[in-house]
Amino acid sequence: MNNMKRSKKPRVSWPPGPKLCQVKVFRTEDSPANVASQPQRHSYPSRKPRGPDLPPGFEGNHYAVKPNVSNIPRIKWKRPPPKFSVNDTWLVGCGGGSSEWQNENLRISKVLEAIYPHRSAIPSRPSVSPAVEAECFDDSKTPAIRLTPIEDESESSSEESSNSKVESGVTANKQGQLETKPLCSTQEQVSGLTGLAPDLSLAASAALTALMKTKEQGSLVDTELLIKFLSDPKLIKNLITDTSGKSSETKNQPIVTNINSATRPVPQPVSAVTASPMARKPQPVIIPQEHSVAVSRSFTNPERRVSPPKPVNGSISPPKPITGKPSSIPMPVHFHVGIAKEQPQPARFPSSSLPMNLNFHRPPNVFSEPKVIVNPQPQHQPYSAFRTSEMNYVQSSIGLGRGPQTGFNSYPMNFSRADAIGSAKPVVQPMKGLDYFKNLIREHGTDNHETNQYHSQTGIFNGRIDNNNKIHQQCIYFGTANGCNMGDSCTYVHDRYRPNFEAAAPRAKRMKFGRYERNGF
């Protein structure tokens, strides 16, 4: 093997030392002597030379002509500027005596500075002209600026003039009579005012001054009649007392009652009113239209007392008719006298004018204070009774809770068949009791924010989806970390008693060692 390697000849043969030289081959145009003299040739074709990139409007050739800067002569300083030398005897101050401080104050106050075309056009002070400074003005002589246009004022004046002409034609005779005898009228007025009280005299004097003004302007007031009223103090007092007496009579109008001697007067007023059922303390009793009667609110004196309850037949006769006032027809009524407890304000009955025949009886263990209920004489025997306690029991069974047993809820109501046939069946609104609001407060903050809502007439359930319409299958999203987005309106069943395994504490994170072992850690 060594012999074979030694026998091989080298492939490259080098000439001897004196003949050894370096040779480079160039093209004629790429020779070192001609590289910089000729431009380089590119393979892509040559394009047209682009002109200068000028904005529109500057394409003219005159912009390309530039002045020769070398031809402009340079100005040489004849003498250098004097050197600034600081003198130690100078005193530096704040500049209070300078004439520029006023101009500086104007600049500080942001007075606008204008550029004037010539020195002669510059005023002494741009904010105030010298002509205004030289003159002395009196502000009291300044005319007032009109708030309304002249056109509107002319229209209003024309309307007032037309109205005054019409009124002057109507009251010309009355004004003439007053002008002929102004002294006697004023004397009568003064003499009439002397007998009045100080307040009445002041009011009368104010009316007289207004009357004298209206006499000049013209009005439709009968001045003679007004003067006659004001000059008579007795007439003024009678007018005041009559108005106060009428108002007091209309407010407190008693009703004469003929009740058996076995019973004593009643302390608590009760009114049977069909037109105003929303009265507060006197409970409204609805009476059929056949026996409807208006009873005054001040039926009895509240200071009277009542004996133990006894059913007594009595009759109420309204007061005798007064001249100029309507009267009502007397009507027999039944009295059921009892002692009632002090109870809170009852809920108002929704139906205001239902033709019902009500017969109120005393429930056991309810009364502790005297109370009178007025009812008309029933014509027919009641065939069916509708108790509000049963209605409350139905409300509690459907989830609305038992309402407060006060007012109308604490008394049974008897509906006669004649009234039921003659009129439509009364619709009773379900009343929400105290338990309903307690449950609502207790459920606040949970997932169930909806309430049980029932239709007022048909009783259709308008709340959540009924369980009968739901698919009997557990919701896969309920109880998870994200939860069900549908909430109570979900068509699947949400089992609230199912154990929630996702809500448990998170487990410890498991370490993965395979990746570290492969990397050699």
Swiss-Prot record:
- Segments of skewed composition (Polar residues): 34-43, 170-185
GO molecular function terms listed in the Swiss-Prot or TrEMBL record:
DNA binding; zinc ion binding
Q: Where are the zinc fingers (C3H1-type)?
A: 469-497
Q: Which PROSITE patterns match?
A: ZF_C3H1 (PS50103)
Does this UniProt record's set of keywords contain NAD? no
> Is the keyword Zinc-finger in the record?
yes
Entry keywords, A to Z: DNA-binding, Metal-binding, Zinc, Zinc-finger
Q: Where is this region: Disordered?
A: 28-60, 142-185, 296-319
Q: Where are the compositionally biased (Low complexity) regions?
A: 159-168
Its domain of life reads: Eukaryota
Q: What is this protein called?
A: Zinc finger CCCH domain-containing protein 45
